[in-house]
Amino acid sequence: MELLLQKGANALGQASDSSSILLEAASGGNPDSVTLLLEYGADANVPKNSGHLPIHVAADRGHLLALKTLVPVTDFAAIKRSGISPIHCAAAGAHPKCLELLIQAGFDVNFMLDQRIRKHYDDHRKSALYFAVSNGDLSSVKLLLSAGAMPNQDPVNCLQIALRMGNYELVSLLLRHGANVNYFCRVNPLHFPSALQYTLKDEVMLRMLLNYGYDTELCFDCPHGDKVHRFSASEGWTSTVIKDTMFCEVITLSWLQHLSGKVVRVMLDYVDQVRICSKLKAVLQKQGLWSEIHFILTNPRSLKHLCRLKIRKCMGRLRLRCPVFMSFLPLPSRLKAYVLYKEYDLYEQGIFTGTW
């Protein structure tokens, strides 16, 4: 390459798709080739037809040394015009070392994909964090969250992706950094926050959500009360039903009824006095935990429990989602732990098998 350049080869040449020689060198990952081309006048800010720059390609392929060379010669304005940050590319390619380099260089971890890029993804993802979570890449997720990445920016919540994977560490990490446990899916919305549907068979995951302020009371909200529930011809979850489905309609489905007693018993640890509707009651009465559930429902809750609920309500869900706020409360450590339901934090206790 050096000989060709010395003989007059054009370092600014481009292929039919506008891919520059520098971009192809970045794709190969040879830092000496990248440096040589730059010395002969190659421009790091010339995009190919797709909008990608050499820095994007180096980040996507995980070529750390080439990336180091390209960072100082790439304009932020050119990156903004491209509609995608090299942060996205490093996260998508699962290259935490490249990601760390870019973060240290000052790239914005909350740069969102431009609409013209977003439309190529079925889920219309926007953030680099979403790419890292989708890959199950804990190292990259930790780097992004530590650098200030916001976990609630995408149409499909990052927490939803982690819950679907059943990845305890990923879910815990997102919750500690402010992931919203009370998000609602845009498709087939339920009457209660959507995250619960991924935890019905897993007590560890269920308590994670409840500890971080999941709106449990909505699960006991039913307009029918003690009256007979109207029959729905399209009862249950399907790809076509779009309605305000109540929790009682979900947990009483034939393939979930056996979980109802365990799920409701756990939920009662997070609410004041609640009333259960006739439909839910009829199913619970057939469960082994019914006597314990009935005792809780028909007796006053302890003052200690009520005080915990009141403190949590005064704190608000935003502070519960970010427990660092607890450090500002003039309360003894044991009381803080009680308010945060630490006795029910099974994951922190090292319990990693949550199937009922």
UniProtKB/Swiss-Prot annotation:
Endpoints of the signal sequence: none
Compartments where located: Cytoplasm, Cytoskeleton, Cilium axoneme
Keyword Cell membrane attributed: no
Annotated InterPro entries: Ankyrin_rpt (IPR002110), Ankyrin_rpt-contain_sf (IPR036770), SOCS_box (IPR001496), SOCS_box-like_dom_sf (IPR036036)
Molecular-function GO term, any one: ATP binding
ANK repeat residues: 17-46, 50-81, 82-111, 124-153, 154-183, 185-218
GO terms under cellular component: cilium; cytoplasm; dynein complex; microtubule
SMART domains, sorted: ANK, SOCS, SOCS_box
Function: Force generating protein of respiratory cilia. Produces force towards the minus ends of microtubules. Dynein has ATPase activity; the force-producing power stroke is thought to occur on release of ADP. Involved in sperm motility; implicated in sperm flagellar assembly. May be a substrate-recognition component of a SCF-like ECS (Elongin-Cullin-SOCS-box protein) E3 ubiquitin-protein ligase complex which mediates the ubiquitination and subsequent proteasomal degradation of target proteins.
Name the UniProt record assigns to this protein: Dynein axonemal heavy chain 12
Record organism: Bos taurus
Gene: DNAH12
